[in-house]
């Protein structure tokens, strides 16, 4: 029973970490990366469609993304969707493809992004601590129902705390990597 609680807590913490990685990948660094455009939806035949289903996105070099649109009639819609996104990008179409040069980040913008990244990381830590609280509550419930002893309860809480510490370290490591990536010029 305790093992199930610990395993559940660990799985939920892992999901929180994956969600945080997803949030971090959406935050633009100085480098071109195809995942930068993941959240963009393109109106395609009257239906909002994810950009990656309408075009192939590749990083041409460290400052340029190249898109190959599958249906040439959708090029204007793709360009418009990219311009309307809050990424501040200006796509240029050339024949059947679209190139997106990424402007270098200003020092002020980098600091703003670092602030955003730190807030996201803190949200990840809070989510992990909430999972710990839930797991410890489940252990306390078992103790109240006399299904486990106090020693087992204490040991389980220590295990849950060590799992929590491990995931908090992973969040801090992700944050440090992202900050370093953002500060590279």
Swiss-Prot record:
Domain of life of the source: Bacteria
Keyword ATP-binding: no
Keyword annotations: Cytoplasm, Protein biosynthesis
Pfam families with a match to the protein in the record: RRF
Sample GO molecular function, one term: ribosomal large subunit binding
Signal sequence coordinates: none
Coiled-coil residue windows: none
Gene Ontology CC: cytosol
Location relative to the cell: Cytoplasm
InterPro entries: Ribosome_recyc_fac, Ribosome_recyc_fac_dom, RRF_sf
GO process terms (BP): cytoplasmic translational termination
Main location: cytoplasm
Family: Belongs to the RRF family.
Reported function: Responsible for the release of ribosomes from messenger RNA at the termination of protein biosynthesis. May increase the efficiency of translation by recycling ribosomes from one round of translation to another.
Protein name stated in the entry: Ribosome-recycling factor
């Amino acid at each position: 029973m305790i093992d199930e609680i610990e395993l559940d807590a660990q799985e939920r913490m892992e999901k929180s970490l994956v969600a945080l990685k997803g949030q971090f990948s959406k935050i633009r660094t100085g480098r071109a990366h195809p995942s930068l455009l993941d959240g963009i939806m393109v109106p395609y035949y009257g239906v909002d469609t994810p950009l990656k289903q309408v075009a192939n996105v590749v990083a041409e070099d460290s400052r340029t993304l190249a898109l190959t649109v599958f249906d040439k009639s959708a090029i204007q819609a793709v360009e418009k969707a990219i311009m309307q996104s809050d990424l501040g990008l200006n796509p240029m179409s050339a024949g059947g493809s679209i190139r997106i040069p990424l402007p270098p980040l200003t020092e002020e913008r980098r600091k703003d992004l670092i602030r955003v990244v730190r807030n996201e990381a803190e949200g990840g830590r809070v989510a992990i601590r909430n999972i710990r609280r839930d797991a410890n509550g489940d252990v306390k419930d078992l103790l109240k129902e006399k299904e486990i002893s106090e020693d087992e309860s204490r040991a389980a809480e220590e295990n849950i705390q060590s799992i929590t510490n491990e995931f908090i370290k992973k969040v801090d490591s992700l944050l440090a990597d992202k900050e370093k990536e953002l500060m590279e010029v």
